[in-house]
Swiss-Prot record:
Belongs to the UPF0502 family. It holds the Pfam family DUF480. This is UPF0502 protein Smlt0097. Coiled coil: none annotated. InterPro entries: DUF480, WH-like_DNA-bd_sf, WH_DNA-bd_sf. It comes from the Bacteria.
């Protein structure tokens, strides 16, 4: 990649499309044996109750429709098979991203505004950053390309939080205030490491349940 800040045309996504795109990136790394994902597996991933903000309840028809829309936008690709159609993401190729940038965007698609520390901790199963500078550089490149934004700090927040712009411009002040009032953010918790490990274990259980559902289906 060059130092140019030009970005390929970026289609705006709705909330369901954004969730599913993030899931495809995540599951490529965490469940490679069942990737690309079937519609059922994508639905299970999208509706996980851990590592998701907000928690959603998307029906199978809406999942299939959103996946087809992502394919039409060039952000996903369908694989046909005799048993079930499967989908893979094309986020990295479509937007000419590095792996690091792709992972950061996926986390923001799945979990909303996060600090640099949260992004680094939560990315470990997808990409292990060499150090904080590597992650910060990837964030700066995404900012230059207008793919994410730094949110203004709400009262009591000690760190900057970042949000993707794949669903369009955001009201940074309102989003930051809502995030603060909800008590979100592991960096402000008493034991952020423990909270994140619990979330990872719960996500692993959800992935196993999704794989079992796929085998039964």
């Amino acid at each position: 990649m060059t130092d140019s800040v030009q970005t390929p045309d970026v289609p705006l996504l709705d909330a369901v499309q954004a969730r599913l795109l993030g899931c495809l990136v995540e599951k490529e790394a965490t469940t490679p044996d069942t990737y690309p994902l079937t519609v059922n597996a994508a639905q299970s991933a999208a509706n996980q109750k851990t590592a998701r903000e907000p928690v959603m309840n998307i029906d199978a028809g809406s999942v299939q429709h959103a996946l087809r829309q992502l394919e039409a936008l060039g952000l996903a690709r369908q694989h046909f098979s005799s048993r079930a159609d499967r989908y893979e993401h094309r986020l990295q190729a479509a937007l000419d991203l590095t792996r690091q940038q792709t992972v950061l965007l996926a986390l923001l698609l799945l979990r909303g505004p996060q600090t640099l520390g949260e992004l680094i901790t939560r990315s470990e199963r997808l990409h292990r950053f060499a150090d904080t500078d590597e992650a910060r550089h990837a964030i700066e490149r995404l900012q230059q390309r207008a793919l994410l934004v730094v949110l203004p700090r709400a009262s009591g927040q000690r760190e900057d939080r970042y949000m993707h712009l794949l669903c369009g411009e955001v009201d940074g002040a309102a989003l930051a205030a809502r995030y603060a009032s909800s008590g979100g953010g592991s960096s402000d918790a008493a034991d952020p490491g423990l909270a994140e490990r619990v979330a990872q274990l719960e996500a692993a259980v959800a992935e196993l349940q999704a794989q079992l559902a796929e085998l039964r289906g």
